[in-house]
Design a protein with these regions (language model features):
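Bacterial N-terminal signal peptides
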Residues: 8-18
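Exported/periplasmic ABC-transporter solute-binding proteins
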Residues: 25-50, 54-90, 95-249
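Bacterial Sec-dependent N-terminal signal peptides
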Residues: 1-7
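Sec/Tat signal peptide C-region and signal peptidase I cleavage site
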Residues: 18-24
Length: 249
């Protein structure tokens, strides 16, 4: 029987979402899996320009945009292009945004397990495999596509267990509660000393393209500041940070 792991409540998300943003003319948000990357980009921009940029983190991108829909200070969203396309009512067209780069789907495994590739998930000693919820996390969508295209969905069956976010999947693998899990490169690199290993999956799913897009109701007084931050994201100054977090241009 599949294990359905509880997602964080939207109410808890809301309490985090609008904290500490009152003075900022740019307020950026992202899903749980890329909080550290976005925070690093914001910190670098603040240091280089002395400009104010606020952040609004908490929950998956769907939960966050549900709060944006109800009104709030967020005016720039960073996530994968496929997820952002679902929010055409809240966000401007993707063409108005900035492509940050591509990031691969990763399979990571716990200590005590050895995999030579993702096809080894079908090995007898792999009893439990975790993946993020495909309705809430892009890497869940990518994992679903990969499992289907490779035929592993039928082979693994009920060995696949669902969590709500990439960080949750990673924590289960680190603790050994799951033998393997589908995550992103940020999570895998950040926990490389706590797991058995990881490998990038190159084919079998739609590419994950990280993108920054303004909200549709961007206020006129905030436009110049948001565009300046987006210009930084598109510049070479952001590239080393993106590469560090597994986003490749």
């Amino acid at each position: 029987m599949k294990l359905k792991l509880a997602a964080a409540s939207i109410a808890a998300c809301a309490s985090l979402l609008f904290a500490g943003t009152a003075a900022a003319e740019v307020t950026v948000t992202t899903g749980a899996g890329y909080v550290k990357m976005v925070q690093a980009l914001v910190d670098a921009y603040r240091t280089q320009t002395k400009s104010q940029v606020g952040t609004a983190f908490g929950g998956n991108i769907g939960q966050i945009l549900a709060q944006v829909r109800e009104g709030g200070k967020v005016n720039l969203v960073i996530s994968d292009a496929t997820s952002l396309q679902k929010f055409s009512k809240e966000l401007k067209d993707l063409k108005t945004g900035v492509k940050l780069g591509d990031t691969p789907l990763i399979v990571a495994w716990r200590k005590g397990v050895t995999l030579s590739g993702p096809e080894d998930l079908d090995k007898n000693d792999i009893k439990r495999v975790a993946m993020p919820d495909p309705k809430a996390a892009v890497y869940g969508r990518a994992a679903t596509e990969y499992l289907a295209s490779s035929g592993l969905d039928k082979k693994l069956g009920d060995r696949v267990n669902m969590a709500s976010t990439v960080p949750q999947v990673m924590s289960y693998v680190v603790r050994g509660e799951m033998d393997a899990g589908f995550v992103n490169l940020v999570a895998a690199r950040g926990n490389k000393d706590k797991i058995g290993g990881f490998i990038a999956i190159k084919d079998g799913y739609k590419p994950v393209v990280m993108t920054a897009v303004p909200v549709k109701d961007l206020k006129a007084q905030d436009k110049a500041d948001v565009e300046a931050f987006m210009a930084f994201l598109a510049s070479d100054k952001a590239t080393p940070i993106l590469n560090k977090f597994g986003v490749v241009r």
